[in-house]
Design a protein with these regions (language model features):
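Short beta-strand/loop segment that forms part of the nucleotide-sugar
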Residues: 48-57, 78-81
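Conserved nucleotide-sugar donor-binding catalytic segment
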Residues: 135, 142-230
Length: 273
């Protein structure tokens, strides 16, 4: 998918004032998708929001669930083969009509209410002060949860979880997820932004409830390999070398602790790379 295709697709969406498009990518995961859909009940029918689901041509009950949920006017889905998670996310961005985009993983849940989101995002939309807005998220390790607060000025890792980052539509018109990366394309996208236009809301309530287990935490070696490659390509000078050193040290620590820590703790380390 190209930038031109994304722009063209978004222009075909009905011209309406949608504040936030929530994008979910799924393939053969109906049970966890239902958790995400259930968390958005308050958002369905609210014209300030829309939910866009990109399905990778599922063969389970996912399509039945999507067809049932399509009764909501602000819900849409596309089911076709894709080239992985980030290709699906790019497709979702192309179909979205909101001023802001949130990529909510299948199985993760929205924690904020529609009015809370409106209160936080409306001023940003009116002032055009940010390309990326970073919120808190609540991370679940089984039955236990902890709040992950965003941090600014960190170039060796994500400022917060990807599911707690809201992107402006204008930013996504000119930046897509690089599908060369299987796990860390979100980190690549973050480093593509102007640091001065990344807004960090440290005092916010959690935007999303997310699972500690994910693609990155289940494949830490591939994750760190991609992080190192991206930092080497995107950063320069002393900033690059500091980032590479920190990523390398984190990777080494995970390797050493892999066989001694419970799986949930290792997943927590992998969540923030």
């Amino acid at each position: 998918m190209t930038i031109a295709q994304l722009t063209c697709e978004s222009d075909t969406v009905a011209n309406q004032e949608v504040l936030l498009s929530i994008i979910t990518v799924v393939r053969n995961d109906a049970q966890r998708l239902l958790k995400t859909i259930d968390s958005l009940v308050e958002f369905y029918g609210d014209e300030r929001f829309e939910h866009v689901v990109i399905d990778g041509k599922s063969s389970d009950q996912t399509l039945d669930l999507l067809q049932t949920n399509s009764r909501h006017k602000n819900f849409q889905y596309l089911s076709e083969s894709d080239n992985g998670i980030y290709d699906g996310m790019n497709k979702g961005a192309g179909r979205a009509s909101g001023q802001f985009l949130l990529f909510l993983n299948c199985g993760d849940r929205m924690a904020a209410s529609p009015d809370q989101l409106d209160e936080l995002l409306r001023p940003v939309a009116q002032t055009d002060e940010a390309d990326i807005v970073c919120f808190c998220s609540r991370v679940y390790h089984g039955a236990h949860a902890g709040v992950l607060r965003p941090q600014s000025g960190r170039l060796h890792k994500m400022p917060t979880s990807h599911q707690a980052m809201v992107f402006s539509k204008e930013f996504m018109r000119t930046h897509l997820y690089d599908t060369r990366y299987r796990i860390a394309a979100d980190f690549n996208l973050y480093l593509s932004a102007n640091a001065a236009r990344v807004l960090v809301l440290t005092g916010s309530e959690p935007l999303t409830d997310i699972e500690a287990v994910g693609v990155a935490s289940e494949n830490p070696w591939q994750s760190y390999k991609e992080y190192l490659q991206i930092a080497a390509e995107k950063l320069h000078g002393s900033t690059k070398w500091m980032a590479l050193a920190r990523i390398g040290c984190k990777a080494a620590a995970v390797i050493l602790l892999k066989k001694t820590l419970p799986k949930g703790w290792l997943n927590a380390l992998g969540r923030r790379a």
